[in-house]
Amino acid sequence: MADLLSSLKNLSNGSGVYQYFDKNRQLLYIGKAKNLKKRIKSYFSIHNNEITPNHRTSLRIQMMVKQIAFLETILVENEQDALILENSLIKQLKPKYNILLRDDKTYPYIYMDFSTDFPIPLITRKILKQLGVKYFGPFTSGAKDILDSLYELLPLVQKKNCIKDKKACMFYQIERCKAPCENKITKEEYLKIAKECLEMIENKDKLIKELQLKMDRLSSNLRFEEALIYRDRISKIQKIAPFTCMDLAKLYDLDIFAFYGKNNRAVLVKMFMRGGKIISSAFEKIHSLNGFDADEAMKQAIINHYQSHLPLMPEQILLNACSNETLKELQEFIYHKHSKKITLNIPKKGDKLALIEIAMKNAQEIFSQEKTSNEEEILEEVRSLLNLECVPYRVEIFDTSHHANSQCVGGMVVYENSAFQKNSYRRYHLKGSNEYAQMSELLTRRALDFAKEPPPNLWVIDGGRVQLNIALETLKSSGSFVEVIAISKEKRDSKAYRSKGGAKDIIHTMSDTFKLLPSDKRLQWVQKLRDESHRYAINFHRSTKIKNMKQIALLKEKGIGEASVKKLLDYFGSFEAIEKASEQEKNAVLKKRN
């Protein structure tokens, strides 16, 4: 406590970010302040050099303050810089008492560029510099389904570069394009098609009606497989915005955020209204053992969503909960980022209050649907058994694969919300000379990416205590808090045999080893994760090996033998790099002379 007391007596009055640590130097919390001295001292009461929590703070904060042993600060130029740095560090370091919202992606927009002679609908996530561009969105899902439908229903120019070819392609032959490249349609006639396209984007019901007619025609002609494609597409487009029955007389452009939470679970709902209609919506489920602060959750949600330059900005942002201080901070952040003054408002009456109530109703409904399942019970049992600080709601699992230290690869699979999240899987080509070096490289590369993709609650490593220690060292170097376990086969004659049916799995933690019965559901849960990572890494290794064998065969055809191929691979690192290298560079590696 002497270190903490000394730090509290020497605080700066400047803007910056503060970090609280416990006695083991584990990061507890990251915050930002316009005046660091004033903000940090608001957490504590100091009497006769004794530090206690400020009783005016919440019970959650008081519980955290009791654990604080050290604090560190980072000074920045102004409060805006502090806000951005705080958000970045929370994502990267995942402190115990901060709320981490993972949904920080930029949603896609559909746009049409009417400055061109023959405009077509395309997808973008950024602002385009051309004049005459009309945007629609954001779409939290279904943008590609809408786009595919438009191209199939209307005789639009099918590709961006079609006009330059000056020759009609197969789309003209199958009556999917009017071939403006050969002047078979005038600009004025094509503009009518483009305007019909606009109507379908703006009026989802009209688009769905046309798709249903197409589906019915296909079914009548016994083309059932094609009809099923349209059925699935209609279903996806219908789910884009479940609130489209809301149609206000006033043509509001609004973004709506509602937060609802109890105990260790919460839901954040986002709704996007354009021209008085809800066009899309999304939600995020959040879990935390240490409770929630609605103000903090809302702040992170707003920063995540508006940190990128967006094609369409709302007139107002509606929230269901936020302190006046945070509202002011966020308004300044958005103005600083987008050079546009947008009001953040907590409505008290009228249409806008009705919108917030709809968002809240949906948040509560989503919250109530997520009842305690067998999976959640197992997660809690796993946490208790392995003495984890957090329930492992999001898990990343790692495995490597190689053959005689060649074609070395690694795989990361992700498990969240009771399912494997295949869109988050990652594959890595590795250079390590042995399995330990390969695992170290794999984990280091993942840790270096924490700023872009925040760390999970838990890492599961396919390996023993050596691999576990490699993971712990990697995380220590990164400064991020992630709990780690490893799972391996028991050793026989000092060797681990994965293929031996009788060999039992052992779970390793930092301080303990667990040998559970094969029927134990906690072991089976960890095994399920390990098996998926092993399958993913093995499959990637096999595909890499096949690809490399083809590349070796091609090089042999060029008169390069296997020994020379090995030299080239050792030097250039990959077959792709060998292909790009000049003959002079290859000869230099092989020490050939002209």
Swiss-Prot record:
CDD domains hit by this protein: GIY-YIG_UvrC_Cho
GO biological process per UniProt: nucleotide-excision repair; SOS response
GO MF, any single term: excinuclease ABC activity
Domain GIY-YIG: 13-99
PROSITE patterns: GIY_YIG, UVR, UVRC
Pfam assignment, any one: UVR
Major localization listed first in the record, in broad terms: cytoplasm
GO cellular component: cytoplasm; excinuclease repair complex
Domain UVR as annotated: residue spans: 205-240
InterPro entries with a match to the protein in the record: GIY-YIG_endonuc, GIY-YIG_endonuc_sf, GIY-YIG_UvrC_Cho, RuvA_2-like, UVR_dom, UVR_dom_sf, UvrABC_protein_C, UvrC
Record localization: Cytoplasm
The entry's keywords: Cytoplasm, DNA damage, DNA excision, DNA repair, Excision nuclease, SOS response
Record-stated family: Belongs to the UvrC family.
Protein purpose: The UvrABC repair system catalyzes the recognition and processing of DNA lesions. UvrC both incises the 5' and 3' sides of the lesion. The N-terminal half is responsible for the 3' incision and the C-terminal half is responsible for the 5' incision.
Binding partners and assembly: Interacts with UvrB in an incision complex.
NCBIfam families for this protein: uvrC
Protein name (database record): UvrABC system protein C
Species whose genome carries this gene: Helicobacter acinonychis (strain Sheeba)
Gene symbol of the encoding locus: uvrC
